[in-house]
Amino acid sequence: MAPFLSAHGESASSSSSSSPTPSRHTRNQHVDYSTPGSTGYNIPQNTTWNAPSNRKIRVLTIGAGISGILMAYQLQKHCENVEHVVYEKNEDVGGTWLENRYPRAGCDIPSHAYTYQFALNPDWPRFFSFAPDIWAYLNKVCETFDLKKYMRFHVEVVGCYWQEHAGEWVVKLREHLPNHEVREFEDRCNVLLYGAGVLNNFKFPDIPGLQDRFKGRVIHTARWPKDYKEEDWAKERVAVIGSGASSIQTVPGMQPYAKHLDIFVRTGVWFGVIAGNSGSQAKEYSEEERENFRRDPKAVVAHAREIEEQVNGMWGGFYAGSMGQKMGSGYFRTRMAEHIKDERLLQGFSPKFGLGCRRITPGDPYMEAIQKENVDVHFTPVESCTEKGVVGGDGVEREVDTVICATGFDVSYRPRFPVIGKDGVDLREKWDLCPESYLGLAIPDMPNFLTFIGPTWPIENGSVMAPLHSVSEYAIQLIKRMQNENIRSWVPRQDITDSFNDHVQEWIKHTVWKDDCRSWYKNNETGRVNAIWPGSSLHYQQVIERPRYEDFEIHSFNDNPWAHLGMGWTVQDRKGPKEEDVCPYFNVKNIDPKWYEACGGDSRLLVERPEESSQAGQQFLWPTGT
């Protein structure tokens, strides 16, 4: 177990190799055992064990998307004496669900699985919801629990700087005011939570001539212009570059209206069924179904569980050579053949890699759209752009009016601004070649810092919502320990983190992700997988259920790291038996039924657990025996 370090970073267990450790006690040594403070150490008098009042903690969250909203709720519900502020660069909450407004932008996880567990939503309009539906849900969560009071909008983070002595992060911020002026200011926090997301920093493809030669319009799906609508598409020939999730959603949204679509695809796609037993990809919930969900919470829970069980049940198919991999691949190939009648298209889209190497995508509307007369699919990358159009790897120039780049995001995990941790370490440089984390949520050299959906996280298997909830609970445990023990800083050890990542990379070799496929899960130049957690979603949740404090370097504000014991008072002791339970160990639920039966009692009384009040205690009589 790693030693607990003092305020000066000195371990109580450290010793010099050149000389023996001196004894704390020697004969004839005069020691004052009666005068408080005679050793120079004074016990804090007002400290109470597990009392939030011991210390105020300030938490700063970057981003008001899924993660930032979750932390606002969790801190409000579970923490006392904690200040929380969320800075968001956009004008409102929602993150990616506010920003992405391309045609049919939505989630590839069924709606009832893409929900906070404390706020199951009976009002989802369809099985796979679109971005406006998801944004409306997130906004309702914020309004219901009054969470926007913690949030400041139009404020972007420009840099984060760790202050070792103070145990704080200094966060430099830039606010864009309504009068178009810009105000720069600083904030400080004890805990910094990075919730900006990994699919947040979009990038255009590096195609010669795309930005400086082509005379038409160039659009990235992540920044879809509000004024580019159906009536515009009807007049244009449009090129769509990419075959990932945004392309698979955009194409069927544009196809019915566009004059012509040229789609450029260089990688096959697994068009799959996700929780197919619970609803079709086009299913809309009727008002009767939604009313039933509103009236009966058990019904909405049962539906969410049915979906989640099917999604999580896919996990076994991701192991290379497994029966699940073989059966799943065969089923999906057969299903694709049923939907794609054109043999050239079927062969072009059929992946040359295992099921799951790239994210499995629900794509029934896409498979239908690519077979329409106004759509041509080219299985080639775009090599360059001319003034009038695009040139594929086949050397053919195709004239278009607009180029849509459905090419994803910068998934290097590197923050867009300086994050300077211990000893001047810049997270951007630390992650320049190879992003590695501790359990997907913490990083060596970055004290009091947690990231949501970091490298090596369960992004590949189902909904992110349950793992995110586990990360939020992990953060709360650390914050409460900081309060109780007056901890200045905690940071995962580099050697422990290295060993964890060695395990991850060895584990990858047993899975489908070792295959040669282009995916944002991996570095496509080196082939190293950076995104995947080495286990199922449920596996991750159980692993991080409680922090492994032995994996951390922990520094206290106190020279004596046991000063947080104070004068020995608990909250219950301070308030007394009229307000608190001062003997919680005497409890009906602690009685072993076998023992109670041996004493002549009826153990069913224990199962029913009568009310543990003073009156219930008077009514509950021990058997006299025989």
UniProtKB/Swiss-Prot annotation:
It is an enzyme of class 1 (oxidoreductase). Transmembrane segments: none annotated. Residues 1-23 have a biased composition (Low complexity). Its cofactor is FAD. FAD binds at T96, W97, L98, E99, D108, I109, Y114. Pfam families: FMO-like. Residues 1-47 are annotated as: Disordered. Residues 31-47 have a biased composition (Polar residues). It comes from the Eukaryota. Binds 1 FAD per subunit. One of its GO terms (molecular function) is N,N-dimethylaniline monooxygenase activity. Pathway: Mycotoxin biosynthesis. InterPro entries: FAD-bind_Monooxygenase_sf, FAD/NAD-bd_sf, Flavin_mOase-like. The keyword Manganese does not apply. NADP(+) binds at G106, C107, D108, S243, G244, A245, S246, S247, I248, Q249, R266, T267. Its EC number is 1.14.13.-. Induction: Expression is positively regulated by the dothistromin-specific transcription factor aflR. Dothistromin biosynthetic proteins are co-regulated, showing a high level of expression at ealy exponential phase with a subsequent decline in older cultures. Keywords: FAD, Flavoprotein, Monooxygenase, NADP, Oxidoreductase. The record marks R359 as: Transition state stabilizer. Belongs to the FAD-binding monooxygenase family. Averufin oxidase A; part of the fragmented gene cluster that mediates the biosynthesis of dothistromin (DOTH), a polyketide toxin very similar in structure to the aflatoxin precursor, versicolorin B. The first step of the pathway is the conversion of acetate to norsolorinic acid (NOR) and requires the fatty acid synthase subunits hexA and hexB, as well as the polyketide synthase pksA. PksA combines a hexanoyl starter unit and 7 malonyl-CoA extender units to synthesize the precursor NOR. PANTHER family: FAD-BINDING MONOOXYGENASE STCW, L-ORNITHINE N(5)-MONOOXYGENASE-RELATED. This is FAD-binding monooxygenase moxY. It comes from Dothistroma septosporum (strain NZE10 / CBS 128990) (Red band needle blight fungus).
